[in-house]
């Protein structure tokens, strides 16, 4: 290679490096822009380290639901302790499908058909009560997402038409947007908390505060109760999952409040308060 050729080669190499340094950031920005943002806004807030609160819907009331859902992060549809049916929840979600609060259901059980019905009607979160062991946690996770990560089957419910809009491919995005919440409510669950929280597909572990007090026999003010709360907290964070408590009064003023992110009920996002039940003074 002549001296002139060597100079040309060196200059060409420098130009190529300079060009790549200019293009690379542009390509990175393009890839970031192409990555879809979660339409599960409640989950997005959790991933950003924020607390989320809900309104509990325990009866069929389309107008009431559509009003309350304007003001909260998510709606906690209560099926464990109510007579609500899936068709009721389906109708409420359909009436105002893109209201602010993300629909989630506390299931009566973690059987396949419960979770399949819930996901097909359009919820973006399932809450599994009274999880004592890994097997029940696995059931909750297994039926909530599509293969290859889980075993949800492909149904024909309204979920696709609700969330598969504006160019969004529901089947390709729902796994990331789904939220699987596990409730620990017994001393047995406390003992197994780390293994439960470590189950793949479990996103959030919350304490069922009232039932934990009932099943343990310790008042929530008892140090032994608080030790159980601390163990669940520590095990959940050690497993890399999000921690929460059903009792929203633990959102502030408690030693673990800074780490507690997911709550049943609590303050609305804009100061709105639900109307008092008939016959009860607000």
PLM region spans:
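Bacterial N-terminal signal peptides that target proteins for export
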Residues: 1-14
